[in-house]
């Protein structure tokens, strides 16, 4: 006979023990603390909940069922479905018409129908203020005082026997007669009220100190900066005049009959060559010319691009050169030159001798004529250039007749005095300088700084 073990009975839970022993007061302290959530873990949660909020998760010493209500899944409310298709129209209620109803519908009620049963409504009348009338009827009379004026009679007539002389222009005849009323309280005579209004002039006068209107200063047009004198450009001065008209002749040997336009010029050098001008070596591009003014001169400039090195991709590497030549200087102010007249304005014939020949000359004896020297008639001066008439002796044969002609007067120029060196009145004596003291120039006070030698190789340091 097999031995049967007794069935194991389940122990009561802490909640069941708390319900039976709480009334009698025999509950163990751990059961009371567990049921009333007063254990050490519950106290830590209470103290930590002062700074941290766990959202009512029911964290405690229970069985982990999520508290009394358990765990509830978090769900979001579904969106309402949007109906598709046309919406239904609300029904229209139509009144039915019976066979005995009238088919004519009157829009306006007949005004001839009198409702005898209804009474007409009369609105109540409220009482207003009372108007008091007086029995005495006295007309209103205004007290108007009449102002007395003195009457003055004035008559003006024109007397034909007396006429006042006119100053500027003749005055028309005036004949008038009438009465002028003047007030006893005022001393001026006026027929109506007059308002004094100052006259405004519309003539605008201006001066240099106070202009009448403001003329806006036009904004200066910003000129492009050429940058011809930057550090990136090599400055080369060209003295060949062909640089102005045909610069391509300085780079390559072209056709001299062809003259290109003033545009950028490009050159291709397939082989090594020497240009006509060594300054234009390896020039592959010459930009268009630019005329500028610098330091009082007119300068003709062109920028050139050298093609000293080419890469495999075909790009050339080279410096930029500024070729320039000075055309002419710019004078600050034009020189004033006094022009001398070619013919003298005043003619002085006092010291002049003209050559006149008798219109009816007689026979000339050749054997008796003398040939004087020209020095006795021609007078010359070394330091004066005054022109005048000179008498020239003529030794004519007997068969040639001389006719008198006009006098030729040359312009007179001012005489230049001769240069005489000034001889000093005092005798010239030699000057001897002797002494041991001297003054050093201020620029030599500071000694020159000696440059420190910097070693570039390790061999210099070792030495």
Curated annotation (Swiss-Prot):
This is Minor capsid protein L2. Interacts with major capsid protein L1. Interacts with E2; this interaction inhibits E2 transcriptional activity but not the DNA replication function E2. Interacts with host GADD45GIP1. Interacts with host HSPA8; this interaction is required for L2 nuclear translocation. Interacts with host importins KPNB2 and KPNB3. Forms a complex with importin alpha2-beta1 heterodimers via interaction with the importin alpha2 adapter. Interacts with host DYNLT1; this interaction is essential for virus intracellular transport during entry. It comes from Pygmy chimpanzee papillomavirus type 1 (PCPV-1). It comes from the Viruses. One of its GO terms (biological process) is microtubule-dependent intracellular transport of viral material towards nucleus. Disulfide bonds join 21-27. The lineage of its organism: Viruses, Monodnaviria, Shotokuvirae, Cossaviricota, Papovaviricetes. It is found in: Virion; Host nucleus; Host early endosome; Host Golgi apparatus. InterPro entries: Late_L2 (IPR000784). Belongs to the papillomaviridae L2 protein family. GO terms for cellular component: host cell; host cell endosome; host cell Golgi apparatus; host cell nucleus; viral capsid. GO terms for molecular function: DNA binding; structural molecule activity. A motif (Nuclear localization signal) lies at residues 1-12, 446-454.
């Amino acid at each position: 006979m097999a031995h049967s073990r007794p069935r194991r009975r389940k122990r009561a839970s802490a909640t069941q023990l708390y319900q039976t022993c709480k009334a009698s007061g025999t509950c163990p302290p751990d059961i009371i603390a567990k049921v009333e959530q007063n254990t050490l873990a519950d106290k830590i949660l209470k103290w930590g909940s002062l700074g941290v909020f766990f959202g009512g998760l029911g964290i405690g010493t229970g069985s982990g069922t999520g508290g009394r209500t358990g765990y509830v899944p978090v769900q979001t409310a579904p969106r309402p479905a949007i109906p598709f298709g046309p919406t239904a129209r609300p029904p229209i209620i139509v009144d039915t018409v019976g066979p005995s109803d009238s088919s004519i519908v009157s829009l306006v009620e007949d005004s001839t129908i009198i409702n005898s049963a209804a009474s007409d409504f009369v609105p109540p009348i409220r009482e207003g203020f009372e108007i008091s009338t007086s029995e005495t009827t006295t007309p209103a009379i205004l007290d108007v005082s009449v102002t007395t004026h003195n009457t003055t009679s004035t008559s003006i007539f024109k007397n034909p026997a007396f006429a006042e002389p006119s100053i500027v222009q003749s005055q028309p005849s005036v004949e008038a007669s009438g009465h002028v009323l003047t007030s006893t309280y005022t001393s001026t005579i006026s027929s109506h009220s007059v308002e004094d209004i100052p006259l405004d002039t519309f003539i605008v006068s201006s001066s240099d100190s106070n202009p009448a209107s403001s003329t806006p200063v036009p904004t200066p047009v910003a000129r492009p900066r050429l940058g011809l004198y930057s550090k990136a450009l090599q400055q080369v001065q060209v003295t060949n005049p062909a640089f102005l008209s045909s610069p391509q002749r300085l780079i390559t040997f072209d056709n001299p009959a062809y003259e290109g336009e003033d545009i950028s010029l490009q050159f291709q050098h397939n082989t090594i060559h020497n240009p006509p001008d060594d300054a234009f070596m390896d020039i592959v591009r010459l930009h268009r010319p630019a005329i500028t003014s610098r330091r009082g001169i007119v300068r003709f400039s062109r920028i050139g691009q050298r093609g000293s090195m080419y890469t495999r991709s075909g790009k050339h590497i080279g410096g930029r050169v500024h070729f320039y030549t000075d055309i002419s200087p710019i004078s600050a102010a034009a020189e004033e030159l006094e022009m001398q007249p070619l013919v003298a304005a005043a003619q002085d014939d006092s010291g002049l001798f003209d050559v006149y020949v008798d219109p009816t000359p007689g026979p000339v004896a050749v054997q008796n004529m003398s040939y004087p020297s020209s020095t006795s008639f021609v007078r010359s001066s070394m330091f004066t250039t005054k022109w005048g008439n000179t008498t020239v002796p003529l030794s004519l044969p007997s068969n040639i007749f001389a006719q008198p002609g006009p006098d030729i007067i040359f312009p007179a120029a001012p005489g230049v005095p001769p240069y005489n060196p000034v001889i000093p009145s005092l005798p010239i004596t030699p000057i001897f300088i002797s002494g041991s003291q001297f003054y050093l120039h201020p620029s030599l006070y500071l000694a020159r700084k000696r440059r420190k030698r910097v070693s570039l190789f390790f061999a210099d340091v070792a030495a």
